[in-house]
Amino acid sequence: MSSVQKSGLYYPNKFGLITIKSLEEVMGKNGLNAILNLGGLSHYIENYPPDNLDKGFDFTELSAIGSSLEEMYGPRGGRGLALRAGRATFADALRNFGALAGAADLAFVVLPLQSKLRIGLPAFAKIFTQLSDQQTTVEEKDTEWVWTIHKCPCCWGRTGVDKPVCFISTGLLQESLKWVSGGNEFRVNESKCIAMGDPVCEFIVQKEPIS
């Protein structure tokens, strides 16, 4: 895969660093280097993004990692690795930011589950707006939450796929829900994907946890 033209839209360097390190943990340095080469990201071999919140990790780079995982490991294997990378990014980088940092406080812990989500999901969306160029909105419905990404880094530049591909975002969302809820797992399903031709990437979160 050749290098894609840069988007000019960015995630913080730290998000890129954690994504790359989480993949190295699973597949080893040689496996990671193969993914980086395949995605046109050889400049990150032995030269990871810096550990800071500067906007320096281009959306095309995250998209290239996702598509390279699929290409090398197949849709199922790539999906699992991308979900893991997304979860790791939340656990290592995001849960201590802003309103999310208060999720372990007693005053928050004793709130009813849906109240936690009403506070936590918009707070999570706001963090992306503050730290990155990702634009996210949240809408509450009767039995579900709708999490919408209007400029999506996970599938930036991709077209012509027949199924949603934004598994890094799915993993981020799953782990954020687990953190905010105090340990529950929720069903998260990507229902729309820009790479499929949809105008946005949309994720449906069932309000009732599965565990």
Where are these regions (language model features)?
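Short terminal or interdomain "cap/linker" segment that borders an active site or interface and mediates
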Residues: 2-18, 129-170, 178-211
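N-terminal low-complexity or simple alpha-helical regulatory segments
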Residues: 2-84, 89-92
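Short alpha-helical "patches" and their helix-cap loops
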Residues: 31-42, 79-85, 106-111, 182-195
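Amphipathic interaction/junction segments at domain boundaries or subunit interfaces
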Residues: 54-165, 178, 192
